[in-house]
Regions:
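Intrinsic disorder
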Residues: 1-114
Length: 114
């Protein structure tokens, strides 16, 4: 079974008003799943659709490492999170976790940035 079938990416969601730079793909979902399976303490944060991009999800690990991918709709990442038994949050309600910012800051210092 393809990921799109399983997670609802192929369902018609009515006429599209906006044309995104690209739609969510199987590879996007698979990347989030691989990230979640290879790290400890992963949580998903759903970001809303914008004029430029489709709905995205940010997976944040326990150490603050993170990745962002398109997911098509919040329902898709909710299904993925349920299957992996991981929490999912709406970033507009909760914001990003402090460990994500701390990770970004550590990376900047390691790379010699400001």
């Amino acid at each position: 079974m393809r990921w799109r079938d399983r997670y609802g990416l192929r369902r018609r969601r009515g006429p599209k008003v906006a044309k995104f730079d690209r739609e969510a793909t199987d590879a996007d979902i698979e990347a989030l799943i691989a990230f979640a399976r290879s790290r400890r303490g992963v949580e998903f944060y759903v970001e809303p659709e914008t004029f430029a991009t489709d709905t995205t999800a940010v997976a944040v690990a326990d150490d603050g490492e993170w990745t962002r991918r398109r997911v098509g709709s919040p329902a898709v990442i909710h299904k993925v999170a349920r299957d992996l038994a991981l929490p999912v949050y709406d970033v507009q309600l909760t914001g990003y976790p402090p460990r994500m910012r701390a990770y970004n800051e550590r990376r900047r210092r390691e790379e010699g940035g400001l």
